[in-house]
From Swiss-Prot:
It catalyses: a 1,2-diacyl-sn-glycero-3-phosphate + CTP + H(+) = a CDP-1,2-diacyl-sn-glycerol + diphosphate. Signal peptide: none annotated. This is Phosphatidate cytidylyltransferase, mitochondrial. Catalyzes the formation of CDP-diacylglycerol (CDP-DAG) from phosphatidic acid (PA) in the mitochondrial inner membrane. Required for the biosynthesis of the dimeric phospholipid cardiolipin, which stabilizes supercomplexes of the mitochondrial respiratory chain in the mitochondrial inner membrane. InterPro entries: Tam41 (IPR015222). GO terms for molecular function: phosphatidate cytidylyltransferase activity.
Length: 321
């Protein structure tokens, strides 16, 4: 952990509320050597403009020519487009390379609770390395986000399934509809994360599973959930608001009717296409965000760094085919 804290010690951390490392450079994946990977960080700040002002003064080389527009404009780019994250990539710190995304506390709160973008919330469905520990309010948001991931995944599974199948669903949620899984990402990524992090996934999700009265863990090879209409209706109502909004919008469009959310959810609980409907709603949130955030990352990184990063991603994708 000290190694990762040292990597971000080059940043101005006065406004930082929470920082974590994620991805294959920080979290072990099956058949991968993380010491050779670039380390990805998310930096949650209570004041994005102040963070960028101090960081441009301290580390101008981390930024593309956008730094010339000043911290106020960078904050606007961060907080008004795509997933509300501003990335600096291919930053050399000692012998490692890092990539860090900056997001405001208010935006991360919105994503964790409502799944507005399923971007940072999606990264936190999976195990991460907490480099700067969060306050209790942030801990509660992360737990609520993971509880939502559990409910969503259970709606995608049959009444009986294995622990590994559940973890595959949880890890796979944030890749639903992500165009990078078609071009640019390792095709075996989900399996590598589950296999390399099984114990950590169990540590994170076991307390949430134990709290779920409608789920019984008989053994790692057999979990049983209540598949009744009442249980499905209960789970649907616990989904984040953005997912529920998408479900309502999609079903009303298909059925050419205008019904409120409660009516739509009650109707869906009695149908046989719950999993497909939930998955479509989640994919509908992620798809445009994955495209717009990738474009934004290329814009913030500058041409040279974007080409280097894209080539590395494409190489990983081709090796996995």
């Amino acid at each position: 952990m000290d190694e990762y804290r040292e990597l971000i010690s080059v940043l101005p951390l006065e406004t930082v509320e929470y920082a974590f490392a994620y991805g294959s450079g920080a979290i072990q994946q099956q058949n991968e050597d993380k010491s050779e990977k670039m380390v990805d960080f998310v930096i949650v700040t209570k004041n994005a403009q102040e963070f960028h002002r101090d960081n441009i003064l301290k580390n101008p080389q981390h930024y593309s020519l956008l730094r010339l527009m000043g911290p106020k404009m960078i904050e606007k780019i961060q907080c008004n487009f795509a997933a509300r994250v501003y990335y600096n990539t291919h930053v050399k710190v000692g012998k490692r390379k890092i990539k860090y995304g900056v997001i405001s506390y208010e935006n991360v709160k919105q994503d964790l609770l409502d799944w507005r973008w399923i971007y940072i919330s999606g990264r936190l469905h999976k195990p991460v390395l907490e480099v700067i520990k969060p306050r209790q309010d942030m801990c509660d948001l992360v737990t609520e986000n993971r509880r939502s991931a559990l409910h969503s995944s259970l709606l995608l599974l049959p009444e009986s399934f294995t622990l590994k199948q559940l973890f595959h669903k949880i890890v796979g949620l944030s890749y639903t509809g992500d165009f990078r899984m078609v071009v640019g990402e390792d095709k075996n990524k989900i399996n590598k994360i589950v296999e390399g992090n099984y114990e950590e996934l169990l540590r994170v999700y076991e307390p949430l599973m134990n709290d779920d009265a409608r789920l019984s863990v008989m053994s790692p090879a057999k979990l049983i959930q209540d598949g009744s209409t009442t249980a499905i209706y209960h789970r649907l109502n616990l989904l984040p608001s953005e997912v529920l909004n998408r479900i309502q919008k999609n079903m009303n469009r298909v059925q050419k009717r205008q019904r409120d959310a409660e009516e739509v959810i009650f109707s869906l609980a009695h149908r046989h296409d719950v999993a497909a409907t939930v998955e479509t709603a989640i994919g509908g949130i992620i798809r445009p965000v994955s495209l717009s955030q990738t474009a934004k990352n290329a814009f913030s990184a500058g041409v040279t760094r974007s080409i280097i990063y894209s080539m590395a991603k494409m190489s990983k994708f081709l090796k996995s085919k």
